[in-house]
Curated annotation (Swiss-Prot):
Source organism (scientific name): Mus musculus (Mouse)
Taxonomic placement: Eukaryota, Metazoa, Chordata, Craniata, Vertebrata
Function: Non-catalytic component of the multisynthase complex. Stimulates the catalytic activity of cytoplasmic arginyl-tRNA synthase. Binds tRNA. Possesses inflammatory cytokine activity. Negatively regulates TGF-beta signaling through stabilization of SMURF2 by binding to SMURF2 and inhibiting its SMAD7-mediated degradation. Involved in glucose homeostasis through induction of glucagon secretion at low glucose levels. Promotes dermal fibroblast proliferation and wound repair. Regulates KDELR1-mediated retention of HSP90B1/gp96 in the endoplasmic reticulum.
Gene: Aimp1
Region Required for fibroblast proliferation, residue ranges: 6-46
Pfam families listed in its UniProt record: tRNA_bind
Name this polypeptide is given: Aminoacyl tRNA synthase complex-interacting multifunctional protein 1
Length: 310
Protein backbone atom coordinates (compact mmCIF):
# COMPACT_ATOMS: atom_id res chain seq x y z
CA UNK A 1 0.00 0.00 0.00
CA UNK A 2 2.88 2.36 0.88
CA UNK A 3 4.51 1.52 -2.45
CA UNK A 4 1.32 2.44 -4.32
CA UNK A 5 1.13 5.76 -2.46
CA UNK A 6 4.75 6.53 -3.33
CA UNK A 7 4.14 5.68 -7.00
CA UNK A 8 1.00 7.84 -7.01
CA UNK A 9 2.88 10.76 -5.48
CA UNK A 10 5.66 10.44 -8.04
CA UNK A 11 3.11 10.34 -10.85
CA UNK A 12 1.42 13.50 -9.53
CA UNK A 13 4.79 15.23 -9.30
CA UNK A 14 5.67 14.13 -12.83
CA UNK A 15 2.27 15.41 -13.98
CA UNK A 16 2.97 18.82 -12.46
CA UNK A 17 6.39 18.92 -14.11
CA UNK A 18 4.84 17.90 -17.43
CA UNK A 19 2.33 20.75 -17.12
CA UNK A 20 5.17 23.21 -16.63
CA UNK A 21 7.00 21.86 -19.70
CA UNK A 22 3.82 22.03 -21.82
CA UNK A 23 3.18 25.63 -20.73
CA UNK A 24 6.77 26.56 -21.55
CA UNK A 25 6.49 24.94 -25.01
CA UNK A 26 3.22 26.82 -25.65
CA UNK A 27 4.99 30.08 -24.83
CA UNK A 28 7.82 29.22 -27.23
CA UNK A 29 5.35 28.43 -30.04
CA UNK A 30 3.57 31.76 -29.43
CA UNK A 31 6.89 33.61 -29.58
CA UNK A 32 7.80 31.90 -32.86
CA UNK A 33 4.42 32.86 -34.34
CA UNK A 34 4.89 36.49 -33.29
CA UNK A 35 8.37 36.52 -34.80
CA UNK A 36 7.10 35.10 -38.12
CA UNK A 37 4.32 37.73 -38.29
CA UNK A 38 6.80 40.53 -37.53
CA UNK A 39 9.20 39.36 -40.24
CA UNK A 40 6.39 39.16 -42.81
CA UNK A 41 5.24 42.69 -41.86
CA UNK A 42 8.77 44.07 -42.22
CA UNK A 43 9.16 42.47 -45.66
CA UNK A 44 5.85 43.96 -46.81
CA UNK A 45 6.82 47.39 -45.44
CA UNK A 46 10.15 47.27 -47.29
CA UNK A 47 8.39 46.29 -50.52
CA UNK A 48 5.91 49.19 -50.17
CA UNK A 49 8.71 51.67 -49.51
CA UNK A 50 10.49 50.60 -52.71
CA UNK A 51 7.25 50.90 -54.70
CA UNK A 52 6.56 54.36 -53.21
CA UNK A 53 10.03 55.54 -54.19
CA UNK A 54 9.49 54.31 -57.77
CA UNK A 55 6.11 56.06 -57.96
CA UNK A 56 7.59 59.33 -56.69
CA UNK A 57 10.32 59.13 -59.32
CA UNK A 58 7.78 58.45 -62.09
CA UNK A 59 5.61 61.39 -60.91
CA UNK A 60 8.56 63.78 -61.02
CA UNK A 61 9.53 62.59 -64.50
CA UNK A 62 5.94 63.07 -65.72
CA UNK A 63 5.91 66.57 -64.21
CA UNK A 64 9.04 67.50 -66.14
CA UNK A 65 7.62 66.06 -69.37
CA UNK A 66 4.43 68.08 -68.85
CA UNK A 67 6.41 71.29 -68.29
CA UNK A 68 8.42 70.73 -71.49
CA UNK A 69 5.26 69.93 -73.47
CA UNK A 70 3.57 73.12 -72.24
CA UNK A 71 6.64 75.16 -73.12
CA UNK A 72 6.70 73.76 -76.67
CA UNK A 73 3.00 74.65 -77.00
CA UNK A 74 3.60 78.24 -75.86
CA UNK A 75 2.01 77.91 -72.40
CA UNK A 76 3.55 80.31 -69.90
CA UNK A 77 4.92 78.64 -66.73
CA UNK A 78 3.38 80.75 -63.97
CA UNK A 79 5.44 79.28 -61.08
CA UNK A 80 8.77 80.17 -62.69
CA UNK A 81 10.09 83.43 -61.20
CA UNK A 82 12.26 85.60 -63.43
CA UNK A 83 15.52 86.85 -61.97
CA UNK A 84 15.13 90.27 -63.72
CA UNK A 85 11.89 92.08 -64.52
CA UNK A 86 10.77 92.23 -68.17
CA UNK A 87 11.25 95.56 -69.87
CA UNK A 88 8.05 97.44 -70.71
CA UNK A 89 9.01 97.94 -74.35
CA UNK A 90 9.19 94.18 -75.06
CA UNK A 91 6.86 92.98 -77.78
CA UNK A 92 4.48 90.09 -77.36
CA UNK A 93 6.59 87.92 -79.64
CA UNK A 94 9.75 88.62 -77.59
CA UNK A 95 7.90 87.70 -74.41
CA UNK A 96 6.85 84.39 -75.90
CA UNK A 97 10.42 83.66 -76.98
CA UNK A 98 11.96 84.65 -73.64
CA UNK A 99 9.49 82.77 -71.45
CA UNK A 100 10.28 79.32 -72.87
CA UNK A 101 13.95 80.11 -72.66
CA UNK A 102 13.73 80.91 -68.96
CA UNK A 103 11.48 77.95 -68.22
CA UNK A 104 13.76 75.62 -70.14
CA UNK A 105 16.80 76.71 -68.15
CA UNK A 106 14.92 76.63 -64.82
CA UNK A 107 13.36 73.18 -65.12
CA UNK A 108 16.64 71.15 -64.80
CA UNK A 109 17.50 73.19 -61.69
CA UNK A 110 14.08 72.44 -60.23
CA UNK A 111 14.56 68.77 -61.02
CA UNK A 112 17.97 68.77 -59.32
CA UNK A 113 16.52 70.49 -56.24
CA UNK A 114 13.74 67.91 -55.98
CA UNK A 115 16.22 65.09 -56.45
CA UNK A 116 18.58 66.58 -53.84
CA UNK A 117 15.68 66.99 -51.39
CA UNK A 118 14.60 63.37 -51.80
CA UNK A 119 18.18 62.13 -51.44
CA UNK A 120 18.50 64.16 -48.23
CA UNK A 121 15.31 62.62 -46.82
CA UNK A 122 16.48 59.10 -47.71
CA UNK A 123 19.86 59.81 -46.10
CA UNK A 124 18.21 61.12 -42.91
CA UNK A 125 15.93 58.08 -42.68
CA UNK A 126 18.90 55.74 -43.21
CA UNK A 127 20.89 57.53 -40.51
CA UNK A 128 17.97 57.36 -38.04
CA UNK A 129 17.51 53.64 -38.72
CA UNK A 130 21.24 53.12 -38.24
CA UNK A 131 21.21 54.99 -34.93
CA UNK A 132 18.17 53.02 -33.70
CA UNK A 133 19.79 49.72 -34.70
CA UNK A 134 23.03 50.68 -32.96
CA UNK A 135 21.12 51.54 -29.76
CA UNK A 136 19.27 48.21 -29.86
CA UNK A 137 22.51 46.31 -30.48
CA UNK A 138 24.21 48.24 -27.68
CA UNK A 139 21.40 47.40 -25.22
CA UNK A 140 21.48 43.73 -26.23
CA UNK A 141 25.27 43.65 -25.97
CA UNK A 142 25.20 45.16 -22.47
CA UNK A 143 22.76 42.45 -21.35
CA UNK A 144 24.74 39.69 -23.05
CA UNK A 145 28.01 40.97 -21.57
CA UNK A 146 26.76 40.39 -18.01
CA UNK A 147 28.25 37.22 -16.52
CA UNK A 148 25.89 34.29 -16.06
CA UNK A 149 25.97 33.87 -12.30
CA UNK A 150 23.74 34.24 -9.24
CA UNK A 151 23.82 38.07 -9.42
CA UNK A 152 21.31 37.75 -12.30
CA UNK A 153 18.73 36.21 -9.94
CA UNK A 154 16.20 38.46 -8.18
CA UNK A 155 16.07 36.53 -4.90
CA UNK A 156 13.97 38.15 -2.16
CA UNK A 157 12.53 37.34 1.22
CA UNK A 158 8.77 36.80 1.19
CA UNK A 159 6.03 35.99 3.66
CA UNK A 160 3.24 33.59 2.67
CA UNK A 161 0.05 35.46 3.56
CA UNK A 162 -2.31 32.64 2.56
CA UNK A 163 -1.89 29.16 1.12
CA UNK A 164 -4.50 26.75 -0.23
CA UNK A 165 -4.77 23.67 -2.40
CA UNK A 166 -4.80 24.23 -6.16
CA UNK A 167 -8.40 23.72 -7.38
CA UNK A 168 -7.30 21.52 -10.30
CA UNK A 169 -4.12 19.80 -9.05
CA UNK A 170 -3.83 17.75 -5.86
CA UNK A 171 -0.02 18.10 -5.66
CA UNK A 172 0.06 21.91 -5.92
CA UNK A 173 -0.43 24.78 -3.48
CA UNK A 174 -1.51 28.28 -4.50
CA UNK A 175 0.02 30.95 -2.24
CA UNK A 176 -0.31 34.71 -1.93
CA UNK A 177 3.14 35.98 -0.95
CA UNK A 178 4.17 39.41 0.33
CA UNK A 179 7.53 40.37 -1.24
CA UNK A 180 7.54 44.02 -0.22
CA UNK A 181 5.59 45.22 -3.27
CA UNK A 182 2.27 47.06 -3.47
CA UNK A 183 0.36 43.78 -3.90
CA UNK A 184 1.16 40.15 -3.03
CA UNK A 185 2.39 37.79 -5.74
CA UNK A 186 0.54 34.61 -6.63
CA UNK A 187 2.86 31.60 -6.47
CA UNK A 188 2.12 27.98 -7.41
CA UNK A 189 4.32 25.38 -5.67
CA UNK A 190 4.49 21.59 -5.87
CA UNK A 191 4.89 21.17 -2.10
CA UNK A 192 1.72 19.32 -1.10
CA UNK A 193 3.58 16.03 -0.62
CA UNK A 194 6.40 17.63 1.40
CA UNK A 195 4.97 20.42 3.59
CA UNK A 196 1.61 20.30 5.44
CA UNK A 197 -0.79 23.11 4.56
CA UNK A 198 -0.84 24.51 8.11
CA UNK A 199 2.97 24.93 8.00
CA UNK A 200 2.66 27.05 4.85
CA UNK A 201 0.58 29.78 6.52
CA UNK A 202 2.46 33.00 7.48
CA UNK A 203 5.77 31.32 6.68
CA UNK A 204 8.90 33.29 5.74
CA UNK A 205 10.43 31.99 2.52
CA UNK A 206 13.02 32.76 -0.17
CA UNK A 207 11.51 33.62 -3.56
CA UNK A 208 12.98 33.81 -7.06
CA UNK A 209 11.08 36.80 -8.44
CA UNK A 210 12.34 37.30 -12.01
CA UNK A 211 11.35 34.10 -13.77
CA UNK A 212 8.89 34.74 -16.58
CA UNK A 213 5.36 34.25 -15.13
CA UNK A 214 3.82 30.96 -16.27
CA UNK A 215 0.45 29.28 -15.85
CA UNK A 216 0.36 26.05 -13.87
CA UNK A 217 -2.92 24.22 -14.33
CA UNK A 218 -4.64 27.49 -15.19
CA UNK A 219 -3.17 29.62 -12.37
CA UNK A 220 -0.50 32.20 -13.24
CA UNK A 221 2.56 31.77 -11.02
CA UNK A 222 4.65 34.95 -10.55
CA UNK A 223 7.60 33.57 -8.58
CA UNK A 224 9.14 30.36 -7.23
CA UNK A 225 9.66 29.23 -3.63
CA UNK A 226 13.30 28.15 -3.21
CA UNK A 227 13.82 24.75 -1.58
CA UNK A 228 16.56 22.30 -0.77
CA UNK A 229 15.64 19.30 -2.86
CA UNK A 230 16.50 15.65 -3.36
CA UNK A 231 14.55 12.78 -4.94
CA UNK A 232 13.36 11.72 -1.48
CA UNK A 233 12.88 15.00 0.35
CA UNK A 234 12.16 18.74 -0.06
CA UNK A 235 12.67 21.52 2.53
CA UNK A 236 11.76 25.20 2.15
CA UNK A 237 14.80 27.44 2.67
CA UNK A 238 14.52 29.54 5.84
CA UNK A 239 15.58 33.23 5.81
CA UNK A 240 17.75 34.58 8.66
CA UNK A 241 16.08 35.93 11.80
CA UNK A 242 14.99 39.56 11.50
CA UNK A 243 14.31 39.35 7.76
CA UNK A 244 11.32 41.22 6.36
CA UNK A 245 9.44 40.84 3.06
CA UNK A 246 11.36 42.49 0.22
CA UNK A 247 14.85 41.98 1.70
CA UNK A 248 17.27 41.21 -1.12
CA UNK A 249 19.55 38.16 -1.09
CA UNK A 250 23.08 38.84 -2.38
CA UNK A 251 26.34 36.98 -2.91
CA UNK A 252 29.57 38.73 -1.87
CA UNK A 253 31.63 36.91 -4.49
CA UNK A 254 29.13 37.73 -7.27
CA UNK A 255 28.10 41.42 -7.14
CA UNK A 256 25.67 42.92 -9.64
CA UNK A 257 22.07 43.87 -10.27
CA UNK A 258 19.50 41.17 -11.15
CA UNK A 259 17.78 41.05 -14.54
CA UNK A 260 14.30 42.55 -14.67
CA UNK A 261 13.15 39.22 -16.14
CA UNK A 262 15.25 36.17 -17.01
CA UNK A 263 15.07 35.53 -20.75
CA UNK A 264 13.75 31.96 -21.17
CA UNK A 265 15.40 31.69 -24.60
CA UNK A 266 18.86 32.18 -23.12
CA UNK A 267 18.34 29.51 -20.41
CA UNK A 268 20.01 31.70 -17.75
CA UNK A 269 18.23 30.03 -14.81
CA UNK A 270 18.96 26.59 -16.24
CA UNK A 271 22.69 27.44 -16.37
CA UNK A 272 22.82 28.84 -12.83
CA UNK A 273 20.65 26.28 -10.99
CA UNK A 274 23.11 23.32 -11.07
CA UNK A 275 25.56 25.36 -8.93
CA UNK A 276 23.01 26.03 -6.16
CA UNK A 277 23.54 23.72 -3.15
CA UNK A 278 23.36 23.56 0.61
CA UNK A 279 26.75 23.02 2.23
CA UNK A 280 27.67 20.69 5.10
CA UNK A 281 26.10 23.17 7.57
CA UNK A 282 22.84 23.29 5.56
CA UNK A 283 23.60 26.88 4.42
CA UNK A 284 22.25 27.72 0.96
CA UNK A 285 25.11 28.63 -1.42
CA UNK A 286 26.00 29.41 -5.03
CA UNK A 287 29.46 28.06 -5.90
CA UNK A 288 30.28 28.23 -2.19
CA UNK A 289 29.01 31.81 -1.68
CA UNK A 290 26.14 31.87 0.87
CA UNK A 291 22.65 33.27 0.26
CA UNK A 292 23.05 36.37 2.46
CA UNK A 293 20.70 39.11 3.67
CA UNK A 294 23.04 41.98 4.47
CA UNK A 295 23.33 42.64 8.20
CA UNK A 296 20.92 39.81 9.08
CA UNK A 297 22.56 36.52 8.19
CA UNK A 298 22.34 33.62 5.75
CA UNK A 299 19.56 31.37 4.46
CA UNK A 300 19.58 27.67 5.25
CA UNK A 301 17.67 24.40 5.10
CA UNK A 302 16.41 22.74 8.27
CA UNK A 303 18.24 19.39 7.95
CA UNK A 304 19.26 18.87 4.32
CA UNK A 305 23.03 19.24 3.91
CA UNK A 306 24.85 18.94 0.57
CA UNK A 307 21.60 18.98 -1.39
CA UNK A 308 20.58 20.72 -4.59
CA UNK A 309 18.45 23.87 -4.52
CA UNK A 310 15.56 24.67 -6.85
Amino acid sequence: MATNDAVLKRLEQKGAEADQIIEYLKQQVALLKEKAILQATMREEKKLRVENAKLKKEIEELKQELILAEIHNGVEQVRVRLSTPLQTNCTASESVVQSPSVATTASPATKEQIKAGEEKKVKEKTEKKGEKKEKQQSAAASTDSKPIDASRLDLRIGCIVTAKKHPDADSLYVEEVDVGEAAPRTVVSGLVNHVPLEQMQNRMVVLLCNLKPAKMRGVLSQAMVMCASSPEKVEILAPPNGSVPGDRITFDAFPGEPDKELNPKKKIWEQIQPDLHTNAECVATYKGAPFEVKGKGVCRAQTMANSGIK
